[in-house]
């Protein structure tokens, strides 16, 4: 999800397979999904060293945990992945008495957890966000001054998408998210795998396929370098793109919009594998991370909203006061939660997605 940057030299990347020689926490998370000093400060405070293995994909995470013996003490699964892992018996049920900040979780996320009844007892929310439209304000307005930037019409109507093909359109490489957004746009069940629903979504997507330049989950570099002007993807893409452009001295402005037609919401979590060797270190890390000042630092660095209500006042106002990054209660209620669907439905959706991606 995030671009890999350098971490403190005292931190070791990659999973070590030898015997423990000291107090070591082994965690598995997306690249750059902490503040720059989070792990170093944890080690300085607790004396627990950290081995940070970078997650390639949710599918790899799931495969590692399903086979047991992963070697990790703490993992960071998405909402539906955590649900499947808990149903498979791959996660520990957490002891609330050992967690200091469960009551600090944002009320909206507390309600969102109700959609994941199996994993709620085994996870602590970490960060969250939505899927929406990140765009280069100048390039979009130059081509269409009255562009409906808060509408999926911008992407799903061929006559509009065609106007931005020359400056570059990308879609997140996620069948679950894109198909859910497309089906909801059509007024259909977002997580459906019915043939008639997938056919309707495929028809919608195929009409704009000629104008899609890339399928990728990390569009920041291409946005900043001018290879893209419109991207359907994570809400954090805008914050990261703007920060990167500002650091490079590029006079470009990016915006992010939650589509008025509705979109999906996702939540990443902290969880302890059932076979973790050092669950006590995992609890220590969760409690450290959930302190308001630490969660705010993580949010400010990653560009994603924090799960901690107490941390929100310390979040960068550019994020905190942006209603498309931190939607109000009414907008949040319209977001579509994930759903743990059967394998047969996942395969049907993947077939539709693959056909769309490979079409010319």
Please give the residue ranges for each predicted region.
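Extracytoplasmic/periplasmic substrate-recognition and gating elements
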Residues: 221, 246-301, 359-360
């Amino acid at each position: 999800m995030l671009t890999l940057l350098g971490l403190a030299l005292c931190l070791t990347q990659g999973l070590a397979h030898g015997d423990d020689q000291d107090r070591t926490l082994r965690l598995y998370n997306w690249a750059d999904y902490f503040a720059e000093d989070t792990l170093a400060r944890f080690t300085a405070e607790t004396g627990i060293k950290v081995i940070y293995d970078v997650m390639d994909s949710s599918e790899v995470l799931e495969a590692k945990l399903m086979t047991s013996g992963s070697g990790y003490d703490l993992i960071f699964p998405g909402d539906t992945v955590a649900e499947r892992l808990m149903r498979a018996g791959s996660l520990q049920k957490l002891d609330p008495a050992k967690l200091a900040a469960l009551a600090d979780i944002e009320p909206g996320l507390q309600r969102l957890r109700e959609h994941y009844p199996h994993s709620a007892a085994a996870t602590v929310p970490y960060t969250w966000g939505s899927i929406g439209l990140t765009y280069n304000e100048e390039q979009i307005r130059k081509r269409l001054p009255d562009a409906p930037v808060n509408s999926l019409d911008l992407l799903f109507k061929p006559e509009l998408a065609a106007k931005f093909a020359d400056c570059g359109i990308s879609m997140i490489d996620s069948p679950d998210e894109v198909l859910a957004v497309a089906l909801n746009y059509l007024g259909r069940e977002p997580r459906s795998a019915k043939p008639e629903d997938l056919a309707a979504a495929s028809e919608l997507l195929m009409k704009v396929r000629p104008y899609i330049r890339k399928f990728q989950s990390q569009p920041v570099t291409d946005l900043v370098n001018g290879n893209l002007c419109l991207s359907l993807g994570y809400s954090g893409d805008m914050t990261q793109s703007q920060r990167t452009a500002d650091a490079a001295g590029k006079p470009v402005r990016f915006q992010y919009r939650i589509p008025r037609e509705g979109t999906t919401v996702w939540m990443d979590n902290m969880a302890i594998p059932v076979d973790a060797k050092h669950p006590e270190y995992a609890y220590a890390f969760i409690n450290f991370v959930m302190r308001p000042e630490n969660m705010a630092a993580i949010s400010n660095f990653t560009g994603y909203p924090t799960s901690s209500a107490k941390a929100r006042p310390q979040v960068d106002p550019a994020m905190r006061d942006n209603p498309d990054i931190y939607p109000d209660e009414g907008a949040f209620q319209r977001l579509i939660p994930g759903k743990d669907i059967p394998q047969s439905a996942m395969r049907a959706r993947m077939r539709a997605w693959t056909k769309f991606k490979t079409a010319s």
